[in-house]
Amino acid sequence: MEFLNTDIGSEKRAWVQNMAALHRVETHKLVLIEWQESARLWNSIRAFELTLRNAIDFHYRERLGQNWLIASIERDGVFNTVQCRSTLELIKTASSRIKNPSHSDLVASLTLSFWVRLFEVHQFEACGSTLLEVFTEDRTNLSARRKAYVVRLKKILGLRNRIAHHEWVVYRSGMPKLKITKVCREIDRERLNLLKKHRPPAVGLS
């Protein structure tokens, strides 16, 4: 059972060890399928994260300035409020880990959880309530659409975190059905075409 030597998480490890005693071959196959599907999903989520991150950054560079992340945590910055304090701290922490960080460095260092957070009501409103413009759907009923996107994005984030922590994905009952590619396709194509001319560094995913 060499595959048990890898870091698969305590939940998986206990199940695999118990089942392997009874059904060694079948258990091995199930675990391999789980890992293969987890890897496939992880690659899809990585691609989605890059697409969403770059679209948000391009949008806010147009509206808030080329260095909007640094500006957002200054004395009069959009995130320097009680409601957005946690977002401000995330940017400060990311900045403190990089020597003389550029805007691109900060963008690359922030993970999907940060970009999803920007759709929360306080962060969304602090930046001018324009972030849904990165998507192509009808922009009527702004509040309902924002809430719907928060739900969908958090499901994708939850799946990302389960995979990152080596938890069950394929064989976990009650896992939500996610349409990652559908959400990705909803990002405005005109903006994605512009992004090709102003491509941020494609790094920073953990």
PLM feature spans:
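Amphipathic alpha-helical interface elements
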Residues: 1-206
